[in-house]
Amino acid sequence: MLEQLMEALRCLPGVGPKSAQRMAFHLLQRDRKGGLQLADALSQAMTEIGHCTECRTFTEEEVCHICTNPKRQENGQICVVESPADIAAVEATGQYSGRYFVLMGHLSPLDGIGPSDIGLDVLDYRLRRGDISEVILATNPTVEGEATAHYIAELCKEHQVEASRIAHGVPVGGELELVDGTTLSHSLLGRHKI
């Protein structure tokens, strides 16, 4: 049973055999009550949390609180992100007040992940509905993220919906000599007048 617990803990990202062993021993030696609370919370979350039918983020309702907020629908914007964690990051800026669409990943043909695997058929349907005026592409600046953004931009073009890409560049407080060449290239190409 101990081996089963350690193996189950290894499903978490970044948890290898040693970390799983430490966690299991900690719960059994020092925090059995916490372990039971963790098991209950995990069981409840796995049962009751699903995906929003509009944006695909995690929610306990059929439609999440962002998608049901009428103020979020006024500007006709949706921000396409790869994961629910990306929504939290964008929301933390306080600079965006539209709706979202969560891909739950990115296109990766080598891994067998195609458009329907990341919900692009659902996004296509939403674009056809006609209530979206702009799609803000906020996928990660990786090869897969860029390919996904390009695919979605083409989808937007088919539906005559404006598509924009979030800016990439030198981080605030960063030093140019430490920035990689690709990031610096994006910064130079995406410069704007002040």
From Swiss-Prot:
Outline the extent of the Toprim domain.
Answer: 76-171
Tell me the protein family, please.
Belongs to the RecR family.
> Tell me, what does this protein do in biology?
May play a role in DNA repair. It seems to be involved in an RecBC-independent recombinational process of DNA repair. It may act with RecF and RecO.
Instruction: Show the CDD domains listed in the entry.
Output: TOPRIM_recR (cd01025)
Which residue spans match zinc fingers labelled C4-type?
52-67
Q: Which organism is it from?
A: Vibrio campbellii (strain ATCC BAA-1116)
Its BP terms in the Gene Ontology are: DNA recombination; DNA repair
NCBIfam families, per database record: recR
Question: What keywords is this UniProt entry annotated with?
Answer: DNA damage, DNA recombination, DNA repair, Metal-binding, Zinc, Zinc-finger
Any idea what this protein is called? Recombination protein RecR
Q: Name one GO molecular function term.
A: zinc ion binding
